[in-house]
Design a protein with these regions (language model features):
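Short catalytic/signature loops enriched in Gly
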Residues: 3, 142-145, 236-319
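A short, proline-enriched helix->beta-strand linker immediately N-terminal to the Walker B motif
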Residues: 170-174
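P-loop NTP-binding/switch modules centered on Walker-like glycine-rich loops
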Residues: 56, 177, 181, 185-264
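Conserved ABC ATPase "signature" region
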Residues: 75, 126-146, 255
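Conserved ABC ATPase signature
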Residues: 150-155, 159
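Conserved ABC transporter NBD signature motif
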Residues: 64-75
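A short, flexible loop at the N-terminus of ABC-type nucleotide-binding domains that lies
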Residues: 1-4, 13-26, 57-63, 80-83, ...
């Protein structure tokens, strides 16, 4: 696989009056052109912080402490703000979970989209307006003229998410990062948005990074997936490998905790609210396989098959 984006040993911390909190302790993954890549994990696993760090969108108390983020072989972390503007919202775009908060309440959809398009292109205002109508139509909005003249609060949740996707697509990005784009939507609208993302990905040969805690969404849409726990990617592979042959105990527990149609889930995955030890496996306190080796040092990645990596000491015993 030719790598379009590669994240290597990323470390991200937040600083408060109480000190430093490590949100991402060593995340790494790679995606190719036209890839549909999922990042799954519990709340607090570091998946959103990891992807926002790709565009350096963290708050003021967030600092990238180490690692590399290579886009077409160049490290994004070494670029200045002017260079980053050409990538952020251009070659790499992002849609967020809460579309109402992400849209400016004092701007109509059309005004905001025209501003965005003109920032990244040489279009005049008339051309940009025509492009807005084209984009809103492309994402399935039946009355694009009305939507263009509406304020965010006048649109439904599903319509706002379609607007967010249209805004992200306005610059023809090579990579679209979708941060839990369907979490706040009902099941019917969720299916429509996922179908739309799949259509756009195939039509534009665009790579998509989908962040979610929903394994069902991953199974439905993604080709490859990374499983995050406690700031680390503990397993990475194809969707088939992760679902049919999960190698890490955390991945196994996630899949086992999914409710089954006509039955109950196999086990309850308890939460661990402790900070843990950044130099040990993030699943150590909850793992039924943990032994003295696990308590001694951080595991290394083991390649179970080509492209299928497992972050565990005792991987062979659990397969």
């Amino acid at each position: 696989m030719e790598k379009l984006l590669e994240v290597k040993d990323l470390k991200v911390s937040f600083f408060t009056d109480l000190g430093e909190t490590q949100a991402v302790k060593g995340a790494g993954f790679a995606i190719g052109e036209g890839d549909f890549f999922g990042i799954v994990g519990e709340s607090g696993s570091g998946k959103s912080v990891t992807t926002k760090s790709i565009l350096r969108l963290g708050p003021s108390n967030c600092k990238i402490m180490g690692g590399e983020i290579l886009f077409r072989g160049e490290d994004i972390l070494k670029k200045n703000e002017a260079e980053l503007r050409g990538i952020r919202g251009g070659e790499i775009a992002m849609i967020f979970q809460d579309s109402l908060s992400a849209l400016n309440p004092v701007y109509t959809v059309g005004n905001k989209m025209v501003e965005l398009i003109r920032r990244h292109t040489n279009m005049n205002k008339k051309e940009a307006k025509a492009r807005v109508l084209e984009l809103l139509t492309a994402v399935g909005i039946t009355d694009p003229e009305k939507a263009m003249n509406s304020y965010p609060h006048e649109l439904s949740g599903g319509m706002r998410q379609r607007v967010m996707i249209a805004m992200a697509m306005s610059s023809d990005p090579k990579i679209l990062i979708a941060d839990e784009p369907t979490t706040a939507l009902d099941v019917t609208i969720q299916a429509q948005i996922l179908h739309l993302l799949l259509e756009l990905q195939k039509k534009n040969n665009m790579s998509i990074i989908l962040i979610t805690h929903d394994l069902g969404v991953v199974a439905q849409t993604c080709k490859r997936v990374a499983v995050m726990c406690g700031g680390y990617v503990v397993e990475e592979g194809t969707v088939e490998e992760i679902f049919l042959h999960p190698g890490h105990p955390y991945t196994q527990a996630l899949i086992a905790s999914m409710p089954r149609v006509g039955g109950t889930f196999e086990q309850f995955l308890e939460r661990d609210f402790s900070d843990g030890n950044g130099n040990l496996c993030p699943f150590l306190n909850r793992c039924k396989y943990a032994d003295k080796t696990c308590e001694a040092c951080l595991p290394k990645y083991y390649e179970a098959s080509e492209g299928h990596r497992i972050f565990c000491h005792r991987r062979e015993e659990k397969r």
